């Protein structure tokens, strides 16, 4: 019995010594790791964002991601005020993206690399009609700046980088002559073949063939509406291989439905850049779709339910 008690004392003492040694070892490792982190060369950069001519209403702030082009640097992801600020970045060569994060429907995904970072919107929900379930929302205001070669040196002086973001969302408005508007109760609209996603690294709108929801209504002898999409026309990829359509589901006053499809491929085709203009050509934030004079929708007559109010 006494031998067991003595043995337990020895084991307890041994465990105590082991714990002390382990604690000392962890302390040494922790100090060493802190020294390594403290010695890791981190300089910085001052980013100034110029919004003049871009928008009169500044976003809440921006997200800035630096992607290393070599083994010297490492990925840096941070948030700055709308007008920019200072951020710590290790020396090296970088690719970088900057965008506003205060969007309502735009979702950024694929942030792991410059080659995959992309902005898209989600599916339409809450509209109360099954016809809208396969549609996606048009994007709200989204501003992007991309930098394909930023060199961060080891000097103590903080360099300043002047950057001007650009809007990558365009609003299109349309008006289609319509006969029989008295038969129309409501309209569900979408556009197909336009860019519902935006590749930040490539600076291009991407079409993944999801119809984009359109705001629609009745005007004076017309069905009118608008939609937004990613990228101005000259930035959208593969436009020559895609046909664009306005798709309208017309709900008539008796509850029946009529579909109308209007091709807008030529109307939304981007103008060719003039020699020497390049990226300096100002982009239009709103474009009116001009349709041929003979383009017209005829809504079939239906029996209008009697007015029971009187």
Where are these predicted regions, by residue range?
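Hydrophilic extracytoplasmic domains
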Residues: 241-310
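C-terminal motif of bacterial Sec signal peptides marking the signal peptidase cleavage site
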Residues: 28-30
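Structural motif
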Residues: 48-59, 175-183
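Bacterial signal peptide processing site
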Residues: 32-35
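Bacterial N-terminal signal peptides that target proteins for export
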Residues: 9-18
């Amino acid at each position: 019995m006494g031998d067991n008690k003595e043995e337990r004392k020895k084991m307890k003492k041994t465990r105590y010594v082991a714990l002390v040694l382990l604690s000392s070892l962890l302390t040494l490792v922790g100090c060493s790791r802190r020294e390594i982190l403290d010695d890791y060369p981190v300089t910085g950069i001052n980013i100034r964002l110029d919004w003049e001519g871009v928008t009169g209403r500044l976003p809440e702030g921006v997200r800035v991601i630096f992607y290393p082009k070599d083994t010297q640097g490492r990925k840096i992801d941070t948030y700055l005020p709308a007008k920019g600020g200072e951020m710590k970045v290790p020396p090296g060569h970088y690719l970088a993206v900057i965008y506003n994060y205060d969007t309502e429907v735009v979702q950024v995904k694929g942030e792991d690399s410059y080659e995959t970072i992309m902005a898209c919107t989600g599916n339409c929900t809450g509209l109360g009609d099954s016809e809208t379930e396969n549609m996606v929302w048009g994007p709200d205001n989204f501003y992007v700046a991309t930098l394909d070669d930023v060199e961060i040196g080891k000097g103590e002086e903080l360099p300043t980088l002047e950057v001007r973001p650009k809007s990558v969302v365009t609003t299109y408005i349309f008006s289609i002559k319509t006969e029989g508007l008295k038969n129309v109760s409501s309209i569900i609209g979408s556009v197909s073949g336009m860019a519902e996603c935006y590749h930040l690294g490539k600076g291009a709108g991407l079409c993944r063939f999801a119809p984009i929801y359109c705001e629609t209504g009745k005007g004076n002898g017309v069905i009118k509406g608008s939609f937004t999409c990613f990228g101005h026309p000259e930035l959208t990829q593969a436009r020559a291989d895609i046909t664009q359509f306005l798709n309208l589901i017309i709900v008539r006053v008796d509850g029946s439905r009529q579909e109308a499809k209007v091709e807008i491929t030529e109307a939304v085709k981007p103008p060719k850049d003039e020699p020497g203009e390049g990226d300096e050509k100002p982009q239009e934030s709103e474009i009116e779709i001009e349709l041929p004079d003979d383009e017209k929708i005829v809504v079939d007559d239906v029996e209008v339910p009697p007015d029971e109010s009187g």
